[in-house]
Design a protein with these regions (language model features):
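Helix-to-loop junctions at the C-terminal end of transmembrane segments
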Residues: 46-58, 248-260
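Paired small-residue
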Residues: 73, 84-92, 285-293
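Cytoplasmic helix-loop-helix junction between adjacent transmembrane helices
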Residues: 91-126
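C-terminal membrane-cytosol helix-exit motif in multi-pass small-molecule transporters
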Residues: 159-180
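Juxtamembrane intracellular "pre-TM" segments in multi-pass secondary transporters
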Residues: 175-201
């Protein structure tokens, strides 16, 4: 659920609210896109900082800090009446997402039996999918009732849930860890360079990041502005994508263990252009099916 706060609430939920907040705040697509990009840039900077911080602080401390930042960012977004404060909130949420996500797989894996630890990342991905389902369903319903101004109420709801989860996380979650080894450099590049094929991996992950920035950031806007979908229809497509993420994460984790990570990644990257092309047509039923496949690929 912490993954849902850091990613679904603090990052990916922006895409489903994009048309509403753009029209309600009276800003251009360029400005709205800049806000979304600032969120992603903050996440990127956060990953570099976390690689250094985790060599000095315990993982649980880093994850708590991320949850605090994500919650605070959602609070700023919920009270924002102008773009600058909204951008500030999303930048904080982006940083928080990095502080949350990087330690989370280790903490989750340590809580599972040894033969189930490979499912940790998949379960975290399922949490993100669950968060996307919630955000898209809530935003679709509130936008139908309140109109474009509903985006603020959606962020208020997300902030309330994040605050409750922060309290529960602080009270309940525990993680045993020896004192961190100090001396790691900023960004963790020394450790990264020890991995075989680290350059292709970086390129592949960068392409993946670029794809989700474009797809999740403009998914709803593309369907509503260019394909003429109504709010409920675009929200349904976003919801189906989130549902697929819930089941796709553990599914692809198991598949990669059986057939290898390289083959699984190659299959996913090969399917990307096919699925995106179908969505770009805007034809209702095929686009809904493609949204489901897209959710699996994001997993």
């Amino acid at each position: 659920l912490a993954g849902a706060v850091g990613h679904s609430f603090g990052r990916f939920g922006y895409g489903v609210l994009y048309p509403a907040l753009r029209d309600d705040l009276g800003i251009t697509n360029t400005f709205a896109g800049f806000i979304g990009s600032a969120n992603v840039a903050a996440y990127l900077v956060g990953t570099l900082i976390v690689a250094w911080v985790t060599s000095r602080l315990r993982l649980l401390t880093v994850m708590k800090a991320g949850l605090v930042m994500a919650t605070l960012g959602l609070f700023f977004a919920s009270i924002a009446s102008e773009p600058v404060l909204l951008a500030t909130g999303l930048i904080l949420a982006g940083l928080g997402g990095a502080f949350l996500w990087i330690p989370a797989p280790v903490i989750a894996a340590d809580a599972l039996p040894e033969d189930k630890r490979h499912l940790a990342v998949g379960l975290l991905g399922s949490g993100i999918g669950l968060g996307i389902v919630f955000v898209s369903t809530l935003s679709g319903w509130l936008r139908d009732v309140e109109g474009d101004s509903a985006w603020s109420a959606v962020y208020s709801t997300k902030f309330s849930i994040a605050l409750i989860l922060l309290l529960l996380f602080t009270l309940v979650v525990r993680h045993r860890q020896e004192s961190p080894k100090t001396g790691g450099r900023f960004g963790g590049f020394d450790s990264l360079k020890k991995m075989t094929g680290w350059k292709p991996l970086i390129i592949a992950y960068s392409i993946f990041g670029f794809m989700y920035l474009l797809v999740l950031g403009y998914f709803t806007t593309r369907l509503e502005d260019d394909s003429g979908w109504v709010t409920s229809e675009s929200a349904l497509a976003f919801t189906l994508m989130g549902i697929a993420m819930i089941f796709g994460a553990p599914f692809f984790t198991s598949i990669s263990k059986r057939f290898g990570v390289r083959n699984t990644l190659a299959l996913c990257f090969a399917m990307w252009p096919v699925v995106i092309t179908i969505i770009l047509t805007g034809v209702y039923v095929p686009a809904l099916v493609a949204s489901i496949l897209l959710g699996f690929l994001f997993s």
